[in-house]
């Protein structure tokens, strides 16, 4: 009897391990395929469909994503993006060492990198509470793998195609059409900054009608765009794949 029970336990263990192996293998195949194809759908997009927001998206190629929206995304979300390995270790260390009662609650303190946001949006799920902590280990893994396999250009391309930029609106192209009735490639610097300003909570911080937060944040993003535009690594990433006519114009707004 004891031998049968031990045999059953080993059998269940083998089944579970086999299931985990095939799940891991399938996820790796999907990750490699997404180096060349856009994700067919994400959990956040499924959530939009189920909630009644609909699904407005228009995936575009890297050379159709303008320099100013690339620059605005990095200026707002991850200024170290061209240089890090997927993680902002200094911010992580600072976040872990800060007394939770005294943490700076401003947006950006301990924020995820663009690479982490892509890993979360494409392969995992959104949400806080206990699900946030359950997600951390696979998020670390997928972030490491896309940095290794995709590279910076592809990560930023996917980010600017799949990130939610309004209720049911996904990607810069769909946002440009929804808010300004024009393709993303025709966006002005101010319009690009306005679209990015709705992140990370586009349902609360709306572009149209323009929330007070978006009004403030887009001006901050424009200043940051001016400050980082001449960084050689950022400039290279902003200009990659674009013709001379599509490259960023000199920022003319005033600081302040």
Where are the regions a protein language model picked out?
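Juxtamembrane regions of bacterial inner-membrane/periplasmic proteins
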Residues: 2-256
């Amino acid at each position: 009897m004891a031998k049968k029970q031990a045999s059953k336990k080993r059998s269940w263990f083998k089944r579970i391990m086999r299931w985990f192996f095939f799940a891991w293998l399938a996820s790796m195949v999907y990750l490699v395929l997404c180096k060349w194809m856009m994700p067919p759908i994400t959990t956040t997009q499924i959530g939009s469909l189920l909630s009644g927001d609909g699904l407005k998206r228009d995936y575009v190629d890297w050379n159709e994503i303008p320099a100013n929206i690339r620059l605005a995304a990095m200026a707002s979300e991850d200024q170290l993006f061209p240089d890090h390995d997927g993680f902002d270790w200094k911010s992580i260390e600072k976040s872990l060492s800060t007394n939770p009662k005294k943490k700076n609650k401003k947006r950006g303190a301990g924020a995820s990198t663009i690479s982490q946001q892509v890993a979360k949006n494409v392969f995992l799920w959104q949400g806080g509470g206990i699900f946030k902590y359950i997600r951390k280990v696979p998020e670390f893994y997928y972030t490491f793998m896309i940095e290794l396999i995709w590279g910076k250009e592809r990560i930023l391309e996917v980010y600017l195609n799949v990130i939610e930029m309004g209720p049911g609106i996904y990607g810069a192209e769909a946002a440009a059409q929804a808010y300004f009735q024009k393709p993303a490639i025709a966006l002005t610097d101010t319009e690009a900054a306005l679209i990015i300003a709705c992140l990370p909570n586009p349902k609360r911080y709306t572009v149209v009608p323009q929330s007070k937060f978006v009004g403030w944040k887009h001006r901050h993003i424009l200043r940051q765009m001016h400050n980082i535009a001449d960084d050689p690594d950022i400039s290279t990433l902003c200009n990659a794949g674009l013709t001379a006519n599509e490259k960023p114009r000199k920022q003319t707004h005033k600081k302040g």
